[in-house]
Swiss-Prot record:
InterPro entries: YobH. This is Uncharacterized protein YobH. Keywords: Signal. The gene is yobH. Residues 1-33 form the signal peptide.
Length: 79
């Protein structure tokens, strides 16, 4: 029972941290548009957000992988 309570408390603290900081965590990505685009999906405290990046495997143009963390445009506390 202690394990469950501690797990719930940890999840709540992480969620509050994401809410106040405005960051999202990568939950999925896929290539699109003939492998020239990369669609990244992030989990934020307010839901999910999807971002499109220019993508090449070599990294010469655009990015090779989605960033693990991404700052959201909507932040609860800007103070």
């Amino acid at each position: 029972m202690r394990f469950i309570i501690r797990t719930v408390m940890l999840i709540a603290l992480v969620w509050i941290g994401l809410l106040l900081s405005g960051y999202g965590v990568l939950i999925g990505s896929k290539e699109n548009a003939a492998e020239l685009g990369l669609q990244c999906t992030y989990l934020t405290a307010r839901g999910t957000s999807t971002v499109q990046y220019l993508h090449t495997k070599s990294g010469f143009l655009g990015i090779t992988d989605c960033p693990l963390l991404r700052k959201s445009n909507i932040v609860v506390d800007n103070g």
